[in-house]
């Protein structure tokens, strides 16, 4: 049974168990998908409203983007588990076995690649929420801010799961390239998510 086909409660039970998967990468992907879904909600509450007719085409474009990101991140929940499976098997290979180091290296690269993709998707979600905060229905801007905050956490979680694999790689050039990409996403999009949330909070103070 695919992880994404589990109920929310079943997924949480698996996540809280001693099972190897789902883990941090899968949780990051699911959180990112939830953030994208919040963007979809903003679009659904804005589309077709006379008050927002001037941005209708933008909202329809953003709705398609939100749906695409949501679907991609949901796929990543199981993709992360699938990438970890061969790594778990590689750990079981005797340390003096021929070819173990090469197998480990290949599996570590694969296990790092998925959370990096998750991080990239979460960055796109954050960028989308910036536009939705500006153009979405006033009744739903809290959902854009919530989506940005949730995607920020998912981005950080995904980056952590890149690092847990790259730190063990022998090919330090490859590891550094992956780490640099993850760090660049954190440096650009965490502050953007913070600004989105702060802008929402400042514009919606009491009095």
Where are these regions (language model features)?
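Acidic-glycine-rich active-site phosphate/pyrophosphate-binding loop
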Residues: 1-15, 120-132
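Conserved phosphate/anionic-ligand binding catalytic regions in large, soluble enzymes, centered on
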Residues: 17-40, 140-158
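Amphipathic alpha-helix face/heptad-repeat signature
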Residues: 30-34, 62, 69-76, 111-121, ...
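Transmembrane signal-anchor/signal-peptide helices with a preference for the extracytoplasmic
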Residues: 41-53
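A structural-propensity feature for long, helix-poor, extended segments
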Residues: 50-89, 185, 192
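Long, charge-rich low-complexity segments
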Residues: 79-94, 193-207
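Amphipathic alpha-helical interface segments
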Residues: 80-149, 153, 158, 165
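Preference for long, well-ordered alpha-helical segments
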Residues: 125, 140-207
């Amino acid at each position: 049974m695919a992880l994404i086909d589990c109920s929310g409660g079943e997924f949480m039970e698996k996540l809280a168990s001693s099972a190897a998967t789902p883990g941090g990468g899968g949780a990051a992907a699911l959180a990112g998908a939830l953030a994208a879904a919040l963007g979809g909600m903003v679009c659904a509450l804005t589309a077709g409203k006379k008050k927002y007719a001037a941005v209708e085409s933008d909202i329809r474009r953003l709705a398609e983007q939100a749906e695409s990101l949501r679907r991609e991140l949901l796929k990543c929940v199981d993709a992360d588990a699938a990438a970890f499976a061969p790594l778990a098997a590689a750990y079981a290979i005797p340390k003096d076995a021929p070819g173990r180091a090469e197998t480990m290296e290949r599996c570590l690269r694969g296990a790092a690649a998925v959370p990096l993709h998750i991080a990239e998707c979460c960055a796109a979600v954050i960028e989308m929420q910036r536009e939705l905060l500006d153009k979405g229905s006033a009744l739903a801007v809290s959902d854009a801010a919530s989506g940005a905050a949730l995607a920020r956490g998912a981005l950080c979680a995904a980056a952590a799961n890149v690092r847990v694999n790259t730190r063990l790689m022998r090919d330090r050039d490859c590891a550094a390239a992956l780490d640099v990409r993850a760090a660049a996403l954190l440096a650009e999009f965490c502050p953007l998510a913070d600004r989105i949330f702060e802008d929402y909070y400042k514009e919606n103070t009491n009095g």
